[in-house]
């Protein structure tokens, strides 16, 4: 989702240290290059360095993932993942990245409650292939290794997205080059993790709010053809992985982005033989009375499930205020939608959320379960 581009610290250089998740370096960066106490400045890619929890003096190292757990990796049968699987779904997951692996309270929750993980940033194009043909997998590998060592399913996120896209890709203006670059990127990344990824978000956020295609660099050069190019390359690289189209604001049943956007386009593309297995609804939801509250989500999910796909999934769930009944509404919508295979919340604790100010997650800033967690756990009993 929208993370790196939204958390840049705008404090003048030399006047203030960057706060947690703020930018602290990178090509063209003119702001602060130091982080507040308790944080370290870590390279995400050549263009973006970020303040993350840890110390530059020996802290923040990646822990030994240990011996792989048997089966699905849930040591606690009372965890959310174990409960939702008992209801016939595949997983209850969360978002993490390599910079979370040294956070023991967070990781202990992941091990107990969640059976699937999605990389927040380290599988995006700017992190994986910052320069043409030069692939950097070290940070993504850390999350994949952790997931495999602990029996967690993995959602690959994301192969094509208009944001966090290197400038060299944006500069491409001819069809042949763009096609070749997409095919090579998708093939290389998917092949590296072949057999390890359950779901791939092949294309992410490709629709405008009116249901038309977003005017991304991919669309400017290739029109809608980039969708088929990406999905076919992914299918060829790993025939077993389920391939998804993922987007936000798919939370109102009659909204144009849902109907004439996602559903109509997906039905057309599937009829053309493009191997789209599923639709991912990010579900970044508002409070009651907001534009896209949880109350409208069940009807919207059923509209998405009516498309000609095998699966739907809730991929980046967070809810402004995290009201218990709102979370239960969304969880029940998946339980009552046969095509819905699982739920991923976009982060573990409010402290680590990209919407931190709205306290949108299941655990508070001290990594303690909130009322929403208890309500979800009870709903899954």
Curated annotation (Swiss-Prot):
Induction: Expression is under the control of transcription factor XYR1 and highly induced by xylan, carboxymethylcellulose (CMC), and hop cell wall. Inhibited by the wheat xylanase inhibiting protein I (XIP-I). Keywords: Carbohydrate metabolism, Disulfide bond, Glycosidase, Hydrolase, Polysaccharide degradation, Secreted, Signal, Virulence, Xylan degradation. Disulfide bonds join 334-340. Optimum pH is 6.0. One of its GO terms (cellular component) is extracellular region. Residues 1-18 form the signal peptide. Its EC number is 3.2.1.8. It catalyses: Endohydrolysis of (1->4)-beta-D-xylosidic linkages in xylans. InterPro entries: CBD_sf, Cellulose-bd_dom_fun, GH10, GH10_dom, Glycoside_hydrolase_SF. It is an enzyme of class 3 (hydrolase). Optimum temperature is 50 degrees Celsius. Residues 19-52 form the CBM1 domain. Pathway: Glycan degradation; xylan degradation. The active site is at residues 205, 316. It holds the Pfam family Glyco_hydro_10. One of its GO terms (biological process) is xylan catabolic process. It comes from the Eukaryota. Coiled coil: none annotated. Residues 74-379 form the GH10 domain. PANTHER family: ENDO-1,4-BETA-XYLANASE C, GLYCOSYL HYDROLASE. Endo-1,4-beta-xylanase involved in the hydrolysis of xylan, a major structural heterogeneous polysaccharide found in plant biomass representing the second most abundant polysaccharide in the biosphere, after cellulose. Plays an important role in causing fusarium head blight (FHB) on cereal crops. This is Endo-1,4-beta-xylanase D. The gene is XYLD.
